[in-house]
């Protein structure tokens, strides 16, 4: 029927900018960050390993850390084929799909028009989703490759809601007997690390 596709086509056109923003433009911006001119300010041990939430090759280029000692948990611009994970864990496309299907799934027009709109909305939601639990396998694989860890040093991480699950679900249980050192750029005495 003519016009039945208008809804989801319009939705796709209006939301297409999200894909360009979170994939193309974000990568272009990160690639434009000039790390080769950065001077090292830390003396990092050769035996140290790193989990970085930074998309840039700062550890590799500025500090000479071997790539096998680094896990770029959300991707690195050095790998042109790797998707840089940009967004929030709150943008879960599977939860959105479930909610929309529960709300509109019984509608007479669901199969004819609404379902395609749900698919478009969920695809764009995925473009702005940081799948934290989906990164656990890579994180555990990296950690399994390391020697015994006696000290965990946290630098430059805000411990916000986005990254908290990594600590709660993987790092804290695994390294509960290690010494934990927290380095903050600006002290925030009100902050609590649960």
Can you name each region flagged by the protein language model?
Residues 71-74, 93-96, 174-177:
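Short, surface-exposed linear patches
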Residues 78-80, 177-193:
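Short, flexible loop segments at boundaries between secondary-structure elements
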Residues 83-93:
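Short, surface-exposed amphipathic charged segments that create phosphate/polyanion-binding patches used
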Residues 95-147:
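Acidic, metal/cofactor-coordinating or nucleic-acid-engaging core segments within structured domains
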Residues 1-5, 26, 126, 133, ...:
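Intrinsically disordered regions, especially transient/low-confidence alpha-helical propensity segments
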Residues 1-80, 140-155, 161-172, 182-183:
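Active-site periphery "cap/insert" segments of enzyme catalytic domains
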Residues 66-68, 91, 98-99:
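A two-mode feature
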């Amino acid at each position: 029927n003519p016009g039945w596709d208008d809804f989801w086509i319009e939705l796709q056109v209006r939301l297409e900018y999200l894909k360009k923003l979170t994939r193309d433009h974000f990568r272009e911006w990160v690639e434009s960050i000039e790390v080769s001119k950065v001077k090292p300010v830390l003396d990092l041990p050769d035996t140290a390993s790193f989990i970085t939430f930074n998309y840039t090759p700062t550890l590799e280029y500025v500090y000479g850390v071997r790539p096998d000692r680094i896990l770029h948990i959300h991707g690195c611009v050095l790998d042109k084929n790797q998707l840089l994970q940009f967004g929030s864990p709150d943008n879960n496309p599977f939860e959105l799909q479930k909610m929309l299907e529960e709300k509109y799934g019984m509608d007479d027009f669901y199969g004819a028009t609404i379902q395609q709109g749900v698919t478009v909305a969920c695809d764009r939601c995925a473009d702005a989703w940081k799948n934290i639990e989906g990164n656990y396998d890579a994180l555990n694989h990296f950690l399994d490759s390391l020697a015994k860890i006696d000290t965990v040093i946290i630098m430059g991480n805000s411990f916000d809601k986005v990254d908290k699950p990594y600590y709660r679900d993987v790092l804290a249980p695994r390294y509960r007997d290690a010494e934990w050192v927290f380095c903050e750029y600006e002290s925030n005495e009100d902050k609590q690390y649960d």
